[in-house]
């Protein structure tokens, strides 16, 4: 059986990402990662691509951080495959115990992310992984939370980036996206 190239894996994953015009509102083209996650081969390829990138770019990673909620969908798989810890960043009120919080801006309003204070130890090296980079607000808030508890943000890694929204410019860490629209 022949090896599938990273480029072919990425093309296959892209082919499974759904496009929905005028959702959630008029003028928006929504790109839906769930199409790739319902296809077993695309799911394995996506995991392979993310793991390969992290192994090459950040081999010293100790914790994968996933953002509420689509960031949860593949991050436990990544952490398990890499042999590192996993911790979630959740919306306000969803985590037990002592938490640290950061309010961040959305397109229309604001929201709050929380992280359990003891989830990341001071000095631990972290890669933040999410499905999408749009305006950058959620990834910036996640970086701030990791630093508040003493973690070191090595990089943020996303499956898709909407480059026209310039979210990357707001971020204060290295960023890599598998797919750019």
UniProtKB/Swiss-Prot annotation:
PROSITE patterns given in the database record: PUR_PYR_PR_TRANSFER
GO cellular component terms attached to this protein's record: cytoplasm
Subcellular location, record wording: Cytoplasm
EC numbers for this chain: 2.4.2.7
Pfam families recorded: Pribosyltran
CDD domains hit by this protein: PRTases_typeI
Enzyme class at the top of the EC tree: transferase
GO BP terms in the entry: adenine salvage; AMP salvage; purine ribonucleoside salvage
Pathway: Purine metabolism; AMP biosynthesis via salvage pathway; AMP from adenine: step 1/1
Family per record: Belongs to the purine/pyrimidine phosphoribosyltransferase family.
Function: Catalyzes a salvage reaction resulting in the formation of AMP, that is energically less costly than de novo synthesis.
Complex and partners: Homodimer.
Protein name: Adenine phosphoribosyltransferase
């Amino acid at each position: 059986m022949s090896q599938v190239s990273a480029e072919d894996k990425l093309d296959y994953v892209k082919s499974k990402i759904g496009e929905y015009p005028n959702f959630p509102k008029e003028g928006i083209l929504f790109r839906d990662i769930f199409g790739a996650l319902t296809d077993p081969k695309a799911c394995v390829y996506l995991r392979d691509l993310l793991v390969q990138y992290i192994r090459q770019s950040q081999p010293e990673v100790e914790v994968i951080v996933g953002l509420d909620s689509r960031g949860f969908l593949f991050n436990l798989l990544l952490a398990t495959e890499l042999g590192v810890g996993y911790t979630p960043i959740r919306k306000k009120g969803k985590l037990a115990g002592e938490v640290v919080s950061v309010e961040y801006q959305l397109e229309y309003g604001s929201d709050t992310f929380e992280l359990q204070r003891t989830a990341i130890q001071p000095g631990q090296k972290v890669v933040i992984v999410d499905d999408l980079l749009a305006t950058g607000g959620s990834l910036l808030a996640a970086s701030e939370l990791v630093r508040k508890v003493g973690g070191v943000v090595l990089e943020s890694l996303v499956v898709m980036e909407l480059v026209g929204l310039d979210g990357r410019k707001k971020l204060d860490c290295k960023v890599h996206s598998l797919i750019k629209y």
